[in-house]
UniProtKB/Swiss-Prot annotation:
<feature type="compositionally biased region" description="Basic residues">
    <location>
        <begin position="34"/>
        <end position="43"/>
    </location>
</feature>
<feature type="region of interest" description="Sufficient for transactivation activity">
    <location>
        <begin position="158"/>
        <end position="188"/>
    </location>
</feature>
<protein>
    <recommendedName>
        <fullName>Twist-related protein 1</fullName>
    </recommendedName>
</protein>
<dbReference type="GO" id="GO:0030154">
    <property type="term" value="P:cell differentiation"/>
</dbReference>
<feature type="region of interest" description="Disordered">
    <location>
        <begin position="1"/>
        <end position="102"/>
    </location>
</feature>
<dbReference type="GO" id="GO:0005634">
    <property type="term" value="C:nucleus"/>
</dbReference>
<keyword id="KW-0805">Transcription regulation</keyword>
<dbReference type="InterPro" id="IPR050283">
    <property type="entry name" value="E-box_TF_Regulators"/>
</dbReference>
<dbReference type="InterPro" id="IPR036638">
    <property type="entry name" value="HLH_DNA-bd_sf"/>
</dbReference>
<comment type="subunit">
    <text>Efficient DNA binding requires dimerization with another bHLH protein. Homodimer or heterodimer with E proteins such as TCF3. ID1 binds preferentially to TCF3 but does not interact efficiently with TWIST1 so ID1 levels control the amount of TCF3 available to dimerize with TWIST and thus determine the type of dimer formed.</text>
</comment>
<dbReference type="GO" id="GO:0000981">
    <property type="term" value="F:DNA-binding transcription factor activity, RNA polymerase II-specific"/>
</dbReference>
<dbReference type="GO" id="GO:0000977">
    <property type="term" value="F:RNA polymerase II transcription regulatory region sequence-specific DNA binding"/>
</dbReference>
<dbReference type="GO" id="GO:0046983">
    <property type="term" value="F:protein dimerization activity"/>
</dbReference>
<keyword id="KW-0090">Biological rhythms</keyword>
<keyword id="KW-0517">Myogenesis</keyword>
<comment type="function">
    <text>Acts as a transcriptional regulator. Inhibits myogenesis by sequestrating E proteins, inhibiting trans-activation by MEF2, and inhibiting DNA-binding by MYOD1 through physical interaction. This interaction probably involves the basic domains of both proteins. Also represses expression of pro-inflammatory cytokines such as TNFA and IL1B. Regulates cranial suture patterning and fusion. Activates transcription as a heterodimer with E proteins. Regulates gene expression differentially, depending on dimer composition.</text>
</comment>
<dbReference type="GO" id="GO:0045892">
    <property type="term" value="P:negative regulation of DNA-templated transcription"/>
</dbReference>
Length: 199
């Protein structure tokens, strides 16, 4: 019996069947692994698209499309911001000419006041020169006119103290003024003016 079993050859049909049964068993695990990898990769890709990165990518892609509503809203917002900035610039530009005009008016008013002050001062000095007896060669400046006026007042005080004028002559203002003018001119020419002015 042992010889029959050992010596009995295996038919090629049985070998082909056994080989065919073994081959699918060997081939199934790799195919299953490959399918699992493909499914995992597809799940990962789907998850990446649905995740934060996918959402961000989709948002950026949607913003890049020219006809997307998101871009239209952003464009409107940016246009509104630009309009607001332009309005602010126009308001500031409108305020600057007003300040410049105010400065100009202030300068004009200051110039007018200075001219009035100078004119009134010149008129006062002209009136003082008419009162003070002067020589034909006198070309007095303002400070010289003030000094001469002070000396003339001092001279009048001395005249009143000396009682050189008579009561009759003093009653006539015109004659008294003429005599005082002459006496003051003589007093100046004698050097009293130069001596007193030097002090």
């Amino acid at each position: 019996m042992m010889q029959d079993v050992s010596s009995s050859p295996v038919s090629p049909a049985d070998d082909s069947l056994s080989n065919s049964e073994e081959e699918p068993d060997r081939q199934q695990p790799p195919s299953g692994k490959r399918g699992g990898r493909k499914r995992r990769s597809s799940r990962r890709s789907a998850g990446g698209g649905a995740g934060p990165g996918g959402a961000a990518g989709g948002g950026v892609g949607g913003g890049d499309e020219p006809g997307s509503p998101a871009q239209g809203k952003r464009g409107k917002k940016s246009a509104g911001c630009g309009g607001g900035a332009g309005g602010g610039g126009s308001s500031s530009g409108g305020g600057s000419p007003q300040s410049y005009e105010e400065l100009q008016t202030q300068r004009v008013m200051a110039n007018v006041r200075e001219r009035q002050r100078t004119q009134s001062l010149n008129e006062a000095f002209a009136a003082l020169r008419k009162i003070i007896p002067t020589l034909p060669s006198d070309k007095l400046s303002k400070i010289q006119t003030l000094k001469l006026a002070a000396r003339y007042i001092d001279f009048l005080y001395q005249v009143l103290q000396s009682d050189e004028l008579d009561s009759k002559m003093a009653s006539c203002s015109y004659v008294a003024h003429e005599r005082l003018s002459y006496a003051f001119s003589v007093w100046r020419m004698e050097g009293a003016w130069s001596m007193s002015a030097s002090h």
